[in-house]
Amino acid sequence: MVIIAGVTGVGQSDPSVAASVKDFLLAWESGNYSAAAALTTGRPDSVIQSLRSSYSQLGAQGLVLGMGPITVQGSTAKAYFNASIDLGRGGPPWTYQGHFTLRRHGNGWLVEWSPAVIVPGLGAGDRLAVLTTVPARRPLLDSSGKSLIPPSPTVEVGVRPGRVTNPVATATKLAKVTGLASAEADQVVGQIRAAPPNAFLELIQLSPRRFAHLSAALGKVPDLTHRWVTRRLFRSAVPDITGQVGTEATKQLVQDGDPYRPGTTVGLSGLQQAYQAALTGTPTTEVVVQSESGHQVKVLRRWKGQSGTAVKTTIDLAVQQAARRALSGLGFSGAVVAVQASTGRILAVAEHQAGGLPRVDPLDGQYQPGQAFTIVPTAALLSKGRIGANSRIPCWQPSRVGGQNFVNIPPVPRLKQRFSVDFAHACSTAFTELARLLNPAELSTAAGQFGIGVPWRLPLRPSPFIGSIQKPGSLGETAADSIGTGTVLVSPLDMALAAGVVESGSWHPPSIVTSPSGPTLTSGDKLPVRFKNHVISQLRQLMAGPVKSGAAQAARLPGEKLYGQVGTAPLVGHHKVKTVWFVGFRGGVAFAVVALSRSTAFDPAVLVARDFAEFLPAS
């Protein structure tokens, strides 16, 4: 409805001029262009075309017109009006003041027609256009400021708007091929109509793989074209952390209220999604007048956008490369997660899928850690003074505790009856028997001191798994939990942080972003109580044993000592597949290696751990 904002200067004897102005603005606003044209001096077909095209050229989603002052001098009058146009881009409307002249015609008044009636300064043959300049997506950086997203080939799919014969058909078929919703297809129509006719209008960016998959279908979209460019978008040195980008509007983006335009590259997971708004910034939008030849005549309105902000992470590309190299020769699926033991900063996250086995999720996976978890009951027993490295603890075979039978998997050779030897060889039955010395609360408390189940968060989507252990309800359950089976579930990240406890003396919540910063512990949570120094000292000595003379001897390296513990457990949901672990630290870097295998041998994880430790940069 036309808003009347004060009519002034109209003679009392002739109020019809105000009625003519109101009728013209109302017809124009409502899209009744024939009625509007009949109230002008112009050729009806020309006026109708001008009014209709000006609206479509802007891709407008709404128009509101309001009357302003009117002055009358004899047989002529000058009317001012206010226009507010919704450009459909989630930003403020374009508002301006226009004016036109009216001439007395018989008993009424007609608008003296020219293109300038629509917008002041619009001349014959001119057209309106909306230019949107999207700032380049800002990078995700490693701890030294190097980009985690290397340049890679990218396909920009778009149109030359002046060559599109049917924008609706083009947008509808593009939406069908790429999965855009019908409402988004309508926005694409608006983009095509509003853009300069001769410039390439990018509608969507695709990775080479995605383009190859869709190319046949895209080839059937009328008037569509594409070009190859190089962008930092679709490849990543750390995909588990950075996440993926694409053009889909995810539910989370809608819930977050992030500005989204069809074809815009958005983060779909990981840090790319969590920091979508920061990385993309906001576009610069201009409403311009262009000549018939496509040259820009003037800028009518400009909304200046803002560049995005780079996000700096804790990732160390040298450590990441060491993890990837260590996994590259593995014939099975596996993963490596490394953290700075003294801070919890995540240094590397790598995974490798092979051997027809499922992928290992280094952050959100939920796995039983097997004997690698024995560092937890060991710390609990050392804290209470119930055992020491030289305690006489036989490696039973088999063991029956709390009505449950336990055996050593893989088999353990005949050992000296000393706890340090049991630990070095990951003797499961020694720990199931030692469960008799623990009450259920002591084991779950110790697990919490290693960060298992402690509420923390990272700015990643989906959120990583924090680990879990239920309070055992019986001696048999305590025994099963003591060897990392039973109710114990962890991710590789959880166990890397647990290894960091032994190296640094206390647990630190993980962090992945240093700028902009954010909390890692959930509100109101406190850090776990740290172990006493003598407990950590004894635990370190015990963790030297597996590599020096125990189940992980294959990981022995010259130079700085490598500490660790191994483990194996069935892969949840895959009884014939085992998870094989090495959890340890060297030179301030704590890490966890997980490999899937169809055997119970520790070697796959041990050999990856050896290579990773060897490839680590000198500290």
Role assignments for model-derived ranges:
Residues 523, 606-619:
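Short, gly/Ser/Thr-rich active-site loops of penicillin-recognizing serine hydrolases
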Residues 290-300, 333-370, 380-597, 601, ...:
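Beta-lactam-recognizing serine transpeptidase/beta-lactamase-like catalytic domain environment
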Residues 117-134, 139, 148-159, 164-168, ...:
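Short pre-catalytic segments that frame enzyme active sites
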Residues 2-28, 33, 507:
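C-terminal region of N-terminal signal peptides and the immediate post-cleavage residues
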Residues 12, 16-19, 30-80:
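Short solvent-exposed beta->alpha transition segments
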Residues 82, 95, 103, 110-114, ...:
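Small/polar-residue-rich segments within soluble enzyme cores
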Residues 97-104, 581:
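Hydrophobic/aromatic beta-strand elements that line small-molecule binding cavities or substrate pockets
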Residues 11, 23, 38-39, 86-89, ...:
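Second-shell loop/turn segments in exported
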